Amino acid sequence: MALKERIGTVVSDKMDKTVVVAVINRYPHPTYKKIVSRTTRYKAHDPENTCVTGDRVKIRETRPLSAQKRWAIEEILNKTNQAKEVKK
């Protein structure tokens, strides 16, 4: 079975080694055929704390790493210009 991959935007980097990635899914409504957007937020593992809010990233499915974390950062596609603050 192939691992699932998603592309999304980092919306929160306040946790240690974890980021929240928002993935937008677009699909036609079954009855009205209008394109509907649904946003899903995934908690993803970021072992080096390299991602900052606004980065476009690719995440992949992995084994459960915590109660809510089942995704890991595979690569950073677009880096934002924000400087990362030092976490205390």
From Swiss-Prot:
Q: Name one GO cellular component term.
A: cytosolic small ribosomal subunit
**Which top-rank group of organisms is this from?**
Bacteria
SUPFAM superfamilies according to UniProt: Nucleic acid-binding proteins (SSF50249)
Q: Which InterPro entries match?
A: NA-bd_OB-fold, Ribosomal_uS17, Ribosomal_uS17_bact/chlr, Ribosomal_uS17_CS
Record's keyword annotation contains rRNA-binding: yes
Oligomeric and partner information:
Part of the 30S ribosomal subunit.
Q: Which family does it belong to?
A: Belongs to the universal ribosomal protein uS17 family.
Q: Which NCBIfam families match?
A: PRK05610.1, uS17_bact
* Name of this protein: Small ribosomal subunit protein uS17
